[in-house]
Amino acid sequence: MRKAGRPVWGGLGARIVKAPRALALLLATVIAATPLTFAQPAAAAVFPDDPADPVRAAEYWLDSLGVRAAWQTTRGAGQTIAIIDTGIGSGPPEFQGAVAGGTDVSGIGSSDGRTPVGVVDSNHGSWVASLAAARGTANGTGMVGVAPEAELLSVSLGFGSSATVPFVEQVANAIRWSVDHGATIINLSFTTNTLAWDPLWDSAFEYAFDNDVVVVVAAGNRGSGTTRVGAPATIPGVLTVAGVDPQGNASVQASTQGYTIGVSAPSENLLGVSADGRIVQWSGTSGAAPIVAGIAALVRSAHPDLDVANVINRLIETARPAAGTDPLLYGAGIVDAAGAITATVPTVTENPMGSLSEWIRVYRRADAGPVPDQTVAPVEIDALPPADAATPARSALLPSRESLIYGTLP
């Protein structure tokens, strides 16, 4: 049985934020006016957009990243985003008609993946999903995701002693299930806070890449006890997303740094739809990743001929300069939805985020093939003295998920 440390949600833990009073009052009014029962909205082929709606007005990234401009071309129709997280709530109207399927890989959730798993972080999957592809409510109001015409898959994960399946196996199973059920983009808003990953993930991520699925991963948060990216954000071929504040500066609390960062997206003052329908404000690269996953869905919808390498390359090549220039913090820059769809970008033959197959060939030497026959006699040396006893390693996950607290507006 494989064992692994508990993950840190992705934002790797959304952190408590103190909302400006005006925004808090505005959202409190919206939340108070939200009914406790959820009606099935009428099906519609077109999603109206009212920028004056208080919730839509608070979604600043729709304009700053060129998402509304991109909607003139596509809203993500024909694409499926798998949210591998704590599960997407089944009640909120923003998700009605958006979730095409789901499953649980933890052994403690529901078979459809729609029952939120976890006590402290059970809303996390719903927050993430709402940024990627929430469909709003009626008449262009309510929270809308970046790709509101894309479909979602809800795959619920569990942790530690509560789950009946080791976390490493859960992730591998979740990726394979998502690929087999039509995902074109997979979003992973969690980290293990370690650079290395279990070999079981090698074949799972290769399976996604071999089946032309874009995998978007949150870089992680400084506030969760780490300053550098950790797996799965270190796996070659994934698109790792760092976080910036509304002004385009690297987020001090909500983004780590590392060579594997591809692009940046907003990670502060984000909104999310909770599993019970409440709208909350939160921060973390857990939110930056699904914004980029949604934009990847827009690109794939507008350019259905592009493979994974060229979707990721288009996002990287059209990224706008950030407030700073350090690629360890920003990657190629801040993702630009409109540019990624309309710009002329030469095609590539290799994924700019690297090749997992090549990494495995070089670094998983145990699987590199048989050892060549000896050509000379080996040299014998004296045996080495006994080694000292190993010192137990400290936990790579700081803090543990139990110490992370999610915040809502007063």
Language-model features: where?
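Protease zymogen maturation seam
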Residues: R2, L25-L26, A33-G78, P93-E94
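Sec-dependent N-terminal signal peptides
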Residues: G11, R15-A33, Y406
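Subtilisin-like serine protease catalytic core
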Residues: W71-I81, I88-G101, T115-F167, T256-T260, ...
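Active-site glycine-centered loops adjacent to acidic/histidine catalytic or metal-binding residues
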Residues: D85, G220, G284
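Substrate-binding/access-modulating region of protease and related hydrolase catalytic domains
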Residues: L157-A231, R278-V280
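Extracellular S/T/G-rich loop segment that most often corresponds to the catalytic His/Ser-adjacent loop
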Residues: G230-S301
